[in-house]
Design a protein with these regions (language model features):
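PLP-dependent amino-acid enzyme catalytic core
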Residues: 1-379
Length: 379
């Protein structure tokens, strides 16, 4: 059972291993929303995400015999690092099962904390089922990433910090995957101040919590395909679900394209790297009528490899018409390319790639195809 005493105990314990992330006021988002928007940057946490909170508190509640058997968990990356880091602090062995699509940075960092990593399955649920098999076979103690009240209590320590720093907060906006984070955040928020509105945000293509709330019970999605890999969960936890039903005011959905835009905004306006799952709260702001209110958006993590970052930035620039390509046919004679370049320069465009093809088949004699990729101000 989640009690105020449990949250208070968890808050004291996690201070040993966490960075008390201070709220960051966002001028940019505040202007966009007409509200006072603050960011809770858990991407700046020691393991790059909030998950260390729940993992450390959960392991602290285990007996020495349970720890000595070795720990195992399944994770899309951030819980993996949390468990690996916490296990190292407690001096116990950890085995982590991760989906094969997990970003390399999360795999390598998990290994860097001394854990054994097993890659299995395409999504979290596949990895989870395999981890359960290994736990039963080898007698490991399973540390669930979200369907555990001790884990949820650890995650809820975020609320304690938010309310201590901003007692008059009106809204807390929370990324949602399996439901552990929002369970802890919402339950403690309602204990401390029932007037605080807690809003959960899911990827539209992995809306397992929304589906469960609509059905009145946990349901399993057929698929969970989203760039927000940390929240790609087919079914939420049944142990934490009643707390979500009771304490969460609203759920919102965000498309992948909106996450791409939010990533670009975060990089350009806040100079911060936040992974796609961690941006769900920010991407949903435009759906919330919060004018004149104080809003805290939890940025749940920032573990992202540079290849993924590069791809997201490129897609974001294309999405906003800041990078685009055109093809033109030109007479194959001197001076034509200069004229094209001058026209682009006059419109303040910047050529970043140029392909000149003299072998294109056209009905024009002596023509060449010019394919130009350029950068512009866009939208």
């Amino acid at each position: 059972m989640l009690t105020l005493e449990k949250f208070e105990e968890a808050s004291e314990l996690v201070k040993r291993v966490t960075n008390p992330t201070k709220l960051i006021f966002s001028d940019y988002l505040s202007e966009q929303c007409g509200a006072k928007v603050y960011l809770k940057p858990e991407n700046m946490q020691y393991t790059g995400a909030y998950k260390i909170r729940g993992a450390y508190y959960k392991i602290s509640t285990l007996t020495q015999e349970e720890r000595d058997r070795g720990l195992i968990t399944a994770s899309a990356g951030n819980h993996a690092q949390g468990v690996a880091f916490a296990a190292k602090k407690f001096g116990c062995r950890a085995t982590i099962v991760m989906p094969t699509v997990t970003p390399l940075i999360k795999v390598n960092r998990t290994k860097s904390y001394g854990a054994d990593v097993v890659l299995y399955g395409d999504v979290y649920d596949d990895a989870y089922n395999y981890a359960c098999e290994l736990a039963e076979k080898n007698g490991y103690t399973f540390v669930h990433p979200f369907n555990d009240l001790d884990v949820a209590a650890g995650q809820g320590t975020i609320t304690m910090e938010i309310v201590q720093e901003l007692p008059t907060v009106d809204y807390i906006v929370v990324p949602v995957g399996g439901g552990g984070l929002i369970t802890g955040v919402a339950t403690l928020a309602k204990m401390l101040n029932p007037k605080i509105k807690v809003i959960g945000v899911e990827p539209a293509e992995a809306a397992s919590m929304t589906a469960a709330l609509q059905a009145g019970e946990v349901v399993e999605l057929d698929s969970a395909n989203t760039i927000a890999d940390g929240t790609a969960v087919k079914a939420v936890g049944d142990k934490i679900f009643p707390y979500v039903q009771e304490n969460v005011d609203r759920m919102l959905l965000v498309e992948d394209d909106e996450l791409i835009g939010a990533f670009l905004d975060m990089v350009e306006n806040h100079k911060m790297i936040v992974e796609n799952s961690g941006l769900l709260s920010v991407a949903a702001l435009k759906q919330i009528d919060c004018k004149g209110k104080k809003v805290v958006c939890i940025l749940s993590g920032g573990n992202m490899d540079v290849i993924t970052m590069s791809s997201i930035v490129q897609h974001g620039l294309i999405q906003r018409d800041r990078i685009f390509s055109v093809s033109v046919l030109l007479p194959d004679k001197p001076g034509e390319l200069v004229q094209v370049a001058k026209t682009i320069a006059d419109e303040q465009g910047n050529v970043i790639k140029l392909e000149h093809n003299q072998f294109v088949s056209t009905n024009r004699n002596a023509a060449v195809e010019l394919r130009i990729t350029m950068e512009a101000f866009g939208t």
